[in-house]
Amino acid sequence: MSVKASTRQSGSVIIIDLSGQIKLGEGTAVLRDAVKDLLGKGYKKILLNLGDVNYIDSITVGELISAFTSVRNQGGELKLLHLTKKVRTVLEITRLYTVFDVRDDEAEAIAAFN
């Protein structure tokens, strides 16, 4: 299953809804390009909705870190929303769960942006 991404806006927050398997190749490129495009358009508040992502690999973990760093370096914030059990487990094993601001409620996540 390939990865799909769509964007929507809630106030000043852009939500990227991702679904499928994010892994080396097309999947990581979709994630990278979506974040890069939004930063290029001046958006600084990005919420990655991973509720329909059923698989990530180590390359994807690297892409999440890269996206987080890129957004922060542009003076923005990146948060994660609706982690599936598999994605949450990967982030916990790699001890990155505490690096990201992870939310389970979309309204709460949007309100948490500065």
Where are these regions (language model features)?
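Short acidic-hydrophobic, aromatic-tinged amphipathic segments that line or gate anion-handling sites
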Residues: 101-105
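Short beta-strand/loop segment at the start of cytosolic alpha/beta domains
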Residues: 1-17
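Amphipathic alpha-helical interaction surfaces in cytosolic regulatory modules
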Residues: 22-100
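A short, charged, amphipathic alpha-helix used as a generic interaction element across diverse proteins
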Residues: 113-114
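Short acidic/polar alpha-helix capping motifs at helix-coil junctions
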Residues: 1-2, 53-55, 106
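Short, flexible active-site-adjacent loop segments at beta-strand->alpha-helix junctions, enriched
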Residues: 11, 20, 84, 106
